Amino acid sequence: MLSSVAAYSGAGRDLAMEPHSSVGPLQLRFSPYAFNGGTVLAIAGEDFSIVASDTRLSEGFSIHTRDSPKCYKLTDKTVIGCSGFHGDCLTLTKIIEARLKMYKHSNNKAMTTGAIAAMLSTILYSRRFFPYYVYNIIGGLDEEGKGAVYSFDPVGSYQRDSFKAGGSASAMLQPLLDNQVGFKNMQNVEHVPLSLDRAMRLVKDVFISAAERDVYTGDALKVCIVTKEGIRGETVPLRKD
């Protein structure tokens, strides 16, 4: 009996002296995933697109770094926002960047935003049995120069939207976007096209509000603005507690 117990003992531990809530050997489980928090958001306008994220990288009640933006530039017209497990975010973006270089060398041109979205869908679906723990949002300009946003689930299903939020504070941001950008559940309201200035004010306001309520969102806001002139970035401070 003691030999069977010793077989499941850890280094320097005697499980015979430790209480057990159930009968059976001690099982040690390894989880390949971790949730590192963070929030991403994208809004598409008539001739622009905005992709924004906070910069906090945390796990549980620990903050690993306060300077980890979740927006990655893919081309001069496309930006991707990734939230979830940071290790999978880095791996996935490196794979996408390698595919984009191969495409540019083969075709002598950059891949379009819609083609990048379709490619990302196949990459995610190929890992459906051991998926990347990443929620992706792509923002950019389409072939006609109009703003486009594509949202994904972890196994590759995607759709084109005008606005989308993902990550730890998405449940707070999405209803605000539905109301202020999509004019949902509103009556007798004129649907005015969204301007870049109003979209920027809205992005800043919703992230400031989210940082007040979500412990995984904060420190700073990184905004990537995609227009026909290229991509420019802005940084806005958020609360750091």
From Swiss-Prot:
Q: Which UniProt keywords apply?
A: Acetylation, Cytoplasm, Glycoprotein, Nucleus, Phosphoprotein, Proteasome
Q: Please give a single GO biological process term from the UniProt record.
A: proteolysis involved in protein catabolic process
The chain residues annotated with the modification Phosphotyrosine are Y150
Which residues are assigned to the propeptide feature? 1-28
Which residues in this protein are found as N6-acetyllysine? K204
**Which segments cross the bilayer?**
none
Q: Which Pfam families match?
A: Proteasome
List residues modified as Phosphoserine.
S62, S68, S162
User: What SUPFAM superfamilies does the database record attribute to this sequence?
Assistant: N-terminal nucleophile aminohydrolases (Ntn hydrolases)
Subcellular localization is given as: Cytoplasm; Nucleus
Q: Which residues are glycosylated?
A: S58, S209
Can you quote a single GO CC term? nucleus
As stated in the Swiss-Prot or TrEMBL entry, residues carrying the post-translational modification N-acetylmethionine are: M1
Q: How does it assemble?
A: The 26S proteasome consists of a 20S proteasome core and two 19S regulatory subunits. The 20S proteasome core is a barrel-shaped complex made of 28 subunits that are arranged in four stacked rings. The two outer rings are each formed by seven alpha subunits, and the two inner rings are formed by seven beta subunits. The proteolytic activity is exerted by three beta-subunits PSMB5, PSMB6 and PSMB7. Interacts with SERPINB2. Interacts with RFPL4A.
Role according to the record: Non-catalytic component of the 20S core proteasome complex involved in the proteolytic degradation of most intracellular proteins. This complex plays numerous essential roles within the cell by associating with different regulatory particles. Associated with two 19S regulatory particles, forms the 26S proteasome and thus participates in the ATP-dependent degradation of ubiquitinated proteins.
Family, according to the entry, reads as follows: Belongs to the peptidase T1B family.
**What is the name attached to this protein's record?**
Proteasome subunit beta type-1
Give the originating organism: Bos taurus
Q: What is the lineage of its organism?
A: Eukaryota, Metazoa, Chordata, Craniata, Vertebrata
**Coding gene?**
PSMB1
